[in-house]
Amino acid sequence: MKNLHWQCNQFQQLDNHQLYELMKLRVDIFIVEQKCPYPELDDKDRQVETRHLTAYRDSSLIAYARLLPPGLSYPDPSIGRFAVESSVRNQGIGSLLMEKSLEEIDKLWPDHAIRISAQEHLKEYYEKFGFIKVSDIYLEDGIPHVEMLK
């Protein structure tokens, strides 16, 4: 997709505007849209090895993923807080975000499996990228999830 500008930054590299935008997108999706009242901010965001992958169209943040190093959430690197702004969904941006996330993780932590906690209804979506289900369904913040590995 043309006209997208990608950045992959550590927390310390984000300016105030970028930080506000990505936190707003996460809150809008994970707390407001999904009606899931949980602490969105955690210390994982500020860890030196954590990366914040963002996609901008013009000057607007439209997609975001948080890339976590091995040992922070799982023994393997992981992708989380995967978010696409509602006005640009179903245009292939989520697929581009996943492809870019996988590329960045491969650069940062080569030769590692990648583990995610996926909402159960999105299992087939993640299977398209090579993830396989490795757990039974469990509830995370009241939403059915499965652990998946690539």
Language-model-detected regions and their locations in the chain:
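Short amphipathic alpha-helix that is part of the acyltransferase structural core
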Residues: K2-H52, Y56-S60
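Conserved GNAT acetyl-CoA-binding A-motif
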Residues: M98, I105-A118
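A short beta-turn/loop motif at secondary-structure boundaries
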Residues: D42-Q47, G71, L139-E140
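Conserved acetyl-CoA-binding loop-helix of GNAT-fold acetyltransferases
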Residues: V84, N90-E103
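Conserved catalytic-core motifs of GNAT/GCN5-like acyltransferases
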Residues: R115-S117, E127, I132-E147
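Conserved beta-strand in the GNAT
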Residues: T54, S60-P69, S78, A83
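A conserved beta-turn-beta hairpin within the catalytic core of GNAT-like acetyltransferases
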Residues: P70-I79, R89, L108-H112, G142-P144
